[in-house]
Every structure is written in structure tokens, then in C-alpha cells.
Amino acid sequence: MRILKYGSTGPAVELLQLALDRAHFGELMLDGIFGTKTKNAVLRFQSLNGLVADGIVGPATHRALIPWYTGFATHRVHRNDTLWSIAGLYGSTLRAINIANPGLIAENLQVGSVVTVPLPFDIVPTNIRFTSALTAYCVRGIAARYPFVKIGEVGKSVMGRTLWYLSAGRGDRRVFYNAAHHANEWITVPVLLKFCEQYARAYAYGEKIFGFSASEIFGRTNIYIAPCVDPDGVDLVTGELSSGEYFENAKRIAANYPSIPFPSGWKANIRGVDLNLQYPAGWERAMENKFAQGFVSPAPSDYVGSAPLVAPEARAMYDFTLSLSPELILAYHTQGEVIYWKFLDYEPANSRAIADTFAAVSGYSVEDTPYASGFAGYKDWFIQDFNRPGYTIEAGRGTNPLPISQFDKIYADNLGILVYGALV
């Protein structure tokens, strides 16, 4: 992460403020502005953690804050340590520690061994802007607290950022949920991460989720989640990427489209290719439609690329989906509170009935994709090549990017879809 100091702004400062709040160094306004209160909290944190107290958040201070970014600490066992004393030191619980450390024997702690200690707050924040760095912290935190959740890479973005996936379950049936093919639809990232966290917790504690036994879902279905398909674009829209070669190139591209606000109107990957127009399912028709609208070269949105799958993010999703061969996919977008369920005349078995179930639990409407945007999408390609149920979920209402204040409603509306997707 970049160095933060007095006068810094942006989502990295929001995350810093959140971490300081979590660590009880002041109730800070999460406004993304590194002002006097934030600096004073940093100074107190540095002083109490044996760091140089200069009020500047450099590599050493970031490292010290990682437990409050990720939601877990690592504790090296000392003589006379017990799980009780370790839990008390961090405000954790014995059960949380046992879940995070399968096989750990409380009566046989080895001096020098390392214990993962969950901290007493939710991992996934729902009140700040998301970035690729925050996504990675959440992925790490979920996997550490709930080690039955497996994590890995779908691939890499243009800028080399990891396209993460998480998976949970041991059933033969596989489903695949993904979000943020479009940069300014980044609010869908915490939707999927929060679902993963809630589901993992419900399974670990023997609880239900949306009225269903998490254990039964876990035994029946393996849920795969790719929370952020376009991390470079998300960083551009949320303000984390605000300088450098890639930013300047995106700014030059956007200058050719003055009617699209920059960076808030940016949907594409960092090279100006719309990732949800990159799949080999009527790509030529998508090209005709978008060229007719004037999107003939890299753009903030709607440019189909020079050929299908030239964007590394789309290629990675394509290859990963082929290897996974899921029974059902959900592609999360915003906005409109709409469920798109078919591609051309393809209607996989039960796909309409499943869509109607999703509508019933969410309040969303079921509609056909408009012709002008009805080709070359991820959902379109999946239905065409697999002949299995695939859905684009347009969450929330308003102008993209939707404000994080909509998160609670969006999540409540979509929890049933995410659970039923693993059951139908």
C-alpha cells in the first residue's frame, strides 16, 4: 500500500481510518481525508506499537495494521500461554480460535508455534469504498478465520493484480458466482465477500443462512466466488488509482468521451475494453451494435475489444469456467433490480423456474436482456456453451457507481438468491 500522511485522501485513507477504529485508537469519521484526528490516532498507534511516531503511515505502520485490515492476528506461543490467555489478549473467543486452527490441542500448546487469532469484528467492511487491496485483505481474512474456505487465483489483471476466487463446500455440485465485470459496479464486490463470510461463519458455528442449514449446503454444493473480475478498473473508479502511466492512459481515453464522467463513468478494464463484451457468444453482433453507437476504439465503456477474449481478465474467467464446469453461474452487476436469464433462444432446463424463485426471494423482476446489450456477455457465453442456467443479476437502483449506503438493502435483497443458487 502507498504511504499515507497528513493531507492524503482516498479509499486507502478510509481503510486506515477503519483499521484505527477497529484497533480502538479513536472513533474516526470514515471520510477518506487524512486530517488532524487521523494523524493523532496514527501517532498513538505508532507509540503503543513500538514504531517511529511520525504520523506517517509507511511500510512498517501498514504491517502493524494488517491484523485490523484482515481481521486476524498471528500469535507466537510463549511459556505459560493458554488458549484462554491468548483469547483474552486479543478479545477473541476459544471457539473462534479453535475454528481457525483445526487440530490445535489446548492442553498441548508448543512454545514457539503460531496460532491464528480471529479479532472481534466482521472481516468485510460495508461502509467504505472497495479496492483491489481491500479485496485481498478480505480474502486472506476469510481463509484464515475459516480454513475450510479455499482460495486461489483465477488469473491476473492487466496491471498484474490477482483475480481471486474463494470456494467452500465438499459436494459434487459446483456453482460459480462472480462480480465487478464492470468497474463502476464495484459495490457488488463486498456483496459476494460478505456472503462468503456469513456462509462460512454459519457453517463453522452450525447455524442457518437464509433459513437453510449451512452444513447441508456445504455437503451438497461447492460454491466458488470470484469477487472482483476488474480490479484495475475498480481502483480507478474508487480513486485508489489516481496517478501513473495506466491512470494517464485511461484519462486520455476518457477525454474522447466527454459525456461520460471520469472516473465515475468508467466500466471497462484499465485498457478501455468492456469485459462483459469479451465473450464468444455473438461477439460480432455486439461489435456491430457498439460500433454503431460510436464505441470503435478503447473507451470508458462499451468497446468490445479487437477480438473475443483479448482482455486478460475475460480470458482468465473463460478458462477458469471451462475448467470448473459449474452447474449454475451468477454474474453480479448494477443496477435496476432485474434478473436476466436467457440468451437468444437458449433456455436451459429449469432456468426460467430458477429465475422465478430468485425473483420471489429478492423482489427483483425477471426480464430478457435488451437487444442492444444482449451479446458477448459472460452469462450469454455460459448459457450458449454449457446449456446450463446462468443469470445476470442487476442489483440496486440508481446511477453507477451506487453509493455504499445502498449496501444493506442490496445485500438483504440478494442473500436469498445467493443461497438458493447453491440449492436449486
Where do the language-model regions lie?
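Extracellular-facing binding/remodeling surfaces
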Residues: M1-R2, L18-D31
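Short glycine- and acidic-rich boundary segments immediately preceding or forming the N-terminal edge
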Residues: I3, S85, A96, T116-T162
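Primarily a LysM-type cell-wall glycan-binding module
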Residues: S8-L18, D31-T36, P67-G91, S113, ...
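Conserved hydrophobic/aromatic packing and binding residues within compact polymer-binding modules
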Residues: Q17, V42-F45, I97
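C-terminal accessory segments enriched in acidic
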Residues: H78, L83, R95, V111, ...
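Loop/turn elements at helix/coil->beta-strand transitions in domains of secreted/extracellular proteins
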Residues: P147-K150, R161, D172-R174, G219-Y224, ...
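Short beta-strand-to-loop junctions in surface cap/lid or active-site-entrance loops
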Residues: W164-R173, A180
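Active-site/substrate-binding loop(s) of hydrolase catalytic cores
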Residues: D172, W186-I187, L192-C196, A200-Y340, ...
